[in-house]
Structure formats: structure tokens, C-alpha cells
From Swiss-Prot:
Swiss-Prot/TrEMBL domain comment: The N-terminal domain is essential for RNAP assembly and basal transcription, whereas the C-terminal domain is involved in interaction with transcriptional regulators and with upstream promoter elements.
Protein's organism: Methylocella silvestris (strain DSM 15510 / CIP 108128 / LMG 27833 / NCIMB 13906 / BL2)
CDD domains recorded: RNAP_alpha_NTD (cd06928)
Molecular function terms from GO: DNA binding; DNA-directed RNA polymerase activity; protein dimerization activity
Subunit structure: Homodimer. The RNAP catalytic core consists of 2 alpha, 1 beta, 1 beta' and 1 omega subunit. When a sigma factor is associated with the core the holoenzyme is formed, which can initiate transcription.
EC number: 2.7.7.6
Pfam entry (one): RNA_pol_L
Family of this protein: Belongs to the RNA polymerase alpha chain family.
Protein name in the entry: DNA-directed RNA polymerase subunit alpha
Region (Alpha C-terminal domain (alpha-CTD)): 250-338
GO BP term, example: DNA-templated transcription
Name of encoding gene: rpoA
Amino acid sequence: MIQKNWQELTKPNKLEVISGDDPKRFATIVAGPLELGFGLTLGNSLRRILLSSLQGAAITSVHIDGVLHEFSSIPGVREDVTDIVLNIKDIAIKMPGDGPKRLVLKKQGPGKVTAGDIQTSGDISILNPGLVICTLDEGAEIRMEFTVHTGKGYVAADRNRAEDAPIGLIPIDSLYSPVKKVSYRVENTREGQNLDLDKLTLQVETNGALTPEDAVAFAARILQDQLNVFVNFEEPRRVEATPSIPELAFNPALLKKVDELELSVRSANCLKNDNIVYIGDLIQKSEGEMLRTPNFGRKSLNEIKEVLAQMGLHLGMEVNGWPPDNIDDLAKRFEEHY
């Protein structure tokens, strides 16, 4: 009786990802069908989490040689320091780890100084290298040192100002979120004879530090984690007699589900949308068939081939007796063999 509260609700049967011109930055993500009202509930929750709660990297302060405060001007530099600081705020950075990290920029004029002129180490990337920071006249030069931290949301410059900060260290407003824009819409859809269902469409733009698909996945995981505390019961478990284990004509590892392979979000969703549930379904696909799957590219193919190779399997295999009858029941019974 208790389980009917959630088991009998309509759940999305697939997640469709429609990539934009730059798949690393733009995507439309469609989920459905949903119970009436759940499109608005999930869409609003995911949007708020996407914009406020995902971790990212940002510059928190800058030191410019010869500059004591942000209301100064620099000889040979056309922009005031205030304008330079505003431009620095827009630099998008991808950085693993927590920081802080130091980055240096040195440039001689004439010409434009861009974010791509920042000297980075191997684990830090500037995602918008064409962003103009300032313009130097003939004979002018500039040296800047940036401090980069990781965090979430928006942090005002005043909160980035350390009490023991040296003179000339200018704090900067930090926008950590890798998500730039999120919008959603809810439309009516149907499943069979049920006409009163929702379809949720999310449009997500990131700065390139995360793909939109991964950003939505992380937001959903955050929401799931926050809701766990409200579940104050354990579901009753049915105790059944252990059935005899039949002999199989194939490796029982093929009964393992592909969502247990720890693939990337994109690869896992491509397999799900192509109705590939078990490893036995996957290995019978050829490379050509996989590459014809929507949104499935060479990178995903190589990832799957590597995972299968670790299990002694490969694409294009023939499996006698596949799929077996009662495959879901068999998968549970052979779980101990994986």
C-alpha cells in the first residue's frame, strides 16, 4: 500500500538531449512524460539549483604592478583600472581542486590584452581566451597576478577582501557558477490514453566548464541528496525462497545492466535512449550501429570499447540464446556472479 504513493506515478521513460552549435555550452534537454504538475515542480527546482549551487572557479582578487587601488589609471593603458576589473570579472576559468591558485599575465604594447594572455598550468583552462581585458599603447606594459578559488554562486568583492590583504590587492566580485543561463517550459503530452501529462524542456547554457547535460545531472543529484532527509521510513522487503540457478549458454556478466558501467552521462543517456539495457544488448551492436545513435560520437565509442575490453568483451559479438526469457529475473539471480 505504501509503495503505491510513488510506484503508480508516471515517470519519464527517456531523457532527450538536443545539442546546440557548441555541445559543450548549449543544449536543450527534454524529459517526459511526467505527472501533471511535476513539470513545473522539477523545472523550477532544477533551474534554481543550476544557477546557484554548482561548483565552479572564479578570480577573487587581482594585483596590478604599480596600482594601489581600483580608482587608479595606468600610463599607456587606455582603460581605467575600474574598467579592467569589470572585464576581469567576466573571465571564465576551469580549475580542478579547491585552490587557491595564482595566475600571472605579462604583456607589452601596443595591442589588446586578452584572457588568453594569462599564463596557466596544465590543470587550469581559460574558457573565453578572446575576452579583452585592456588595450596597451606603444611602449606600455602591464603585469597582473590573479588569485583563483573554487566555490558556488555569487560572492561580492567585499567578502573577498581579506583583513590582512597587502596594499594594491584588489578584490573582485566572483561568479562561480559554470551555468550562465537556464530557462524551462512545460507542455502537455500524452502516454497511451492518458492525456493529462507534462513534458519538461530545459534550455541550458554553460561557460564550457561543464556540459549542459552534466550540469543538469549534477543539479538532479543535489536535489536528490537534499530530499533524502525527508524520507523517514524503510520500504518493506519481500522475502522469497532462493530459486535454483539455471545453466546459461552465455557469460552471466552479460546480464549486468549498462548503467552499472560508470560511463559518462552522455554515453549512458545515448544507450538509454537507444533502449540498450544490458551488456548483452550492447556487445551485439557493431561500431557502425553505435555511431548512428543520436548524439553518440567517437569519444563515447572509445569509452565503451575500453570498458568492455576490461571485461574481456567487445562490440559486434554474437550471443546464442540472447535475450533469454525472464531476463530481469535472471539478472537478479545471477547478480552474485558479476
